[in-house]
From Swiss-Prot:
SMART domains to which the protein is assigned, alphabetical: WD40 (SM00320)
Compositionally biased intervals (Polar residues): 312-321
Name of this protein: SVP1-like protein 2
Name of the gene: HSV2
Organism: Candida glabrata (strain ATCC 2001 / BCRC 20586 / JCM 3761 / NBRC 0622 / NRRL Y-65 / CBS 138)
InterPro entries linked to this entry: PROPPIN, WD40/YVTN_repeat-like_dom_sf, WD40_repeat_dom_sf, WD40_rpt
Tree of life domain: Eukaryota
GO biological process, one term: piecemeal microautophagy of the nucleus
């Protein structure tokens, strides 16, 4: 007879998080674990909520995925871990104020991801997206949307401020890879979703009959990552090859920017637009964080509502020109001989990510396998552009990374390098501004 006791986790020892997700405005993030979930304030970092479910012989407490609804008391949960609280094919909306389940949805396969808004609830399975109304009795708004197997998707709620006499317009954008054509992206405006009055008859139709989409030919390889900016004007994509990042207009699908991460293949596992959409942060399995400059950042010049304006990268008076890096031979080699590689645009700054708990840049193999989630720090103080857009330069310069397995929170800042002094007396074009990413602080969670 085996009388050995089960190995118990040592007191004070912590396991990694099953998932880390930021809320819709990136002011908070939730972490799912074997006991339940935690909620932190992004910046300044502080623990806001700890929820530990009670385990029984019949039922565990593990949560595999959690997603907040802004800073409300509602949070979407999916079971996970060694002893899941809920089945892996079930989505539960937890009301932390009432300390009970508000409602739940059950599916035929494992739930990969859930996103929320005050109006919609989107659930991702292996190759399908389900769009429901966010209500105590949720209604399926259209037939399931077929996507590429395990394909990424992004969902963004955009508020467009009207004139003094007009009400603000709220729209919801959904971007997902095509199930039929490799590298093709669909962008849908859920405000154009046709009303489904007859569930039994209408569900026999395809999702295209309910939801028109903008089709973008993004890559030749399968799409690995998709992100929509906060203004809903741009969508960034990366393929499984991981060498190029492309940014398209959500209005007409035209290519606005193309950036090069590197020459070798890499898995780009997270991307994030800055609050104003002037920069894009990208992290890959090379454990390198890149920041790309999309548009000049100067008071009174940026209009996120017109992404086509971002194609201009020249310098105009006090406006800082594009600060991304380019090849030194770009303007030397004749166009007729020049390979496309020489026209590539690299990041404005990058940093190799290392475990902050280790000194002397020791290579940590476990940390190299870890994955982080990116967000940008937002602050209350800001001033306003002449065109009415709120602007805070600090919001475009500060990033937060949260690591799943290591349970580490890091804050990075983008700093301008000092320009070298020129004493030769020769006047010429101003050198390209150089930037660097510096870790400002970190904490264990």
């Amino acid at each position: 007879m085996d009388v050995r006791e089960a190995i118990q986790q040592e007191a004070g020892a912590e396991t990694g998080f099953a998932s880390v997700t930021f809320n819709q405005d990136e002011s908070c993030f939730s972490c799912a674990n074997e006991q339940g979930f935690l909620v932190y304030n992004t910046f300044p970092l502080s623990l806001k909520l700890t929820k530990e479910f009670k385990q029984t012989p019949e039922r565990g407490a593990g949560i595999g995925y959690s997603q907040m609804l802004y800073r409300t008391n509602y949070i979407a949960l999916v079971g996970g871990g060694q002893r899941p609280r809920y089945s892996l094919n079930r989505v539960v909306i937890w009301d932390d104020l009432q300390q009970k389940e508000s409602f739940s949805l059950k599916f035929m396969s494992i739930v990969r991801k859930v996103v929320l808004s005050r109006v919609h609830l989107v659930v991702a399975l292996e190759n399908e997206l389900f769009i429901y109304s966010f209500h105590s009795t949720p209604k399926l708004l259209c037939p399931p949307i077929k996507t590429a197997p395990f394909g990424p998707f992004d969902f963004k709620v955009v508020t467009i401020e009207g004139k003094a006499t007009d009400q603000a317009k709220v729209t919801s954008l959904l971007a997902y890879p095509s199930a039929k054509l490799t590298g093709q992206l669909h962008v849908a405006d859920l405000s154009k979703l046709r009303s489904n009055q007859n569930n039994n008859q209408d569900m026999a139709l395809t999702s295209e009959s309910f939801l028109p989409t903008t089709i973008i030919k993004a890559h030749k390889a399968p799409i690995r990552n998709v992100r929509i900016n906060n203004q809903g004007t741009m969508v960034a994509t990366a393929s499984r090859k991981g060498t190029l990042i492309r940014i398209f207009s959500t209005h007409n699908g035209i290519l606005l920017k193309e950036f090069r991460r590197g020459l070798d293949r890499a898995e780009i596992y997270d991307m994030c637009f800055s609050p104003l959409g002037t920069r894009l942060a990208v992290v890959s399995d090379k454990q390198t964080l890149h920041v790309f400059q999309i548009a000049p950042m100067a008071e009174g010049t940026l209009n996120p509502a017109n992404p086509e304006d971002h194609q201009s990268s020249g310098s105009n008076g006090h406006i800082k020109a594009n600060t991304n890096q380019v090849h030194s031979l770009r303007n030397i080699v004749p166009t007729s001989w020049k390979p496309k590689y020489l026209d590539s645009v690299w990041s404005m700054c990058k940093v190799h990510l290392r475990n902050p708990k280790l000194r002397n840049n020791v290579n940590d193999l476990a940390f190299n396998e870890d994955r982080c989630t990116i967000a940008w720090c937002r602050q209350n103080r800001s001033h306003t552009f002449k065109n009415g857009n709120h602007f805070n330069e600090n919001e475009e310069n500060k990033l937060v990374l949260v690591w799943k397995n290591s349970r580490i929170w890091e804050k990075y800042v983008i700093l301008e390098k000092e320009a070298p002094n020129s004493n030769d007396g020769i006047k010429g074009p101003s050198p390209l501004t150089e930037w660097e990413l510096v870790r400002e602080s970190w904490r264990e969670l």
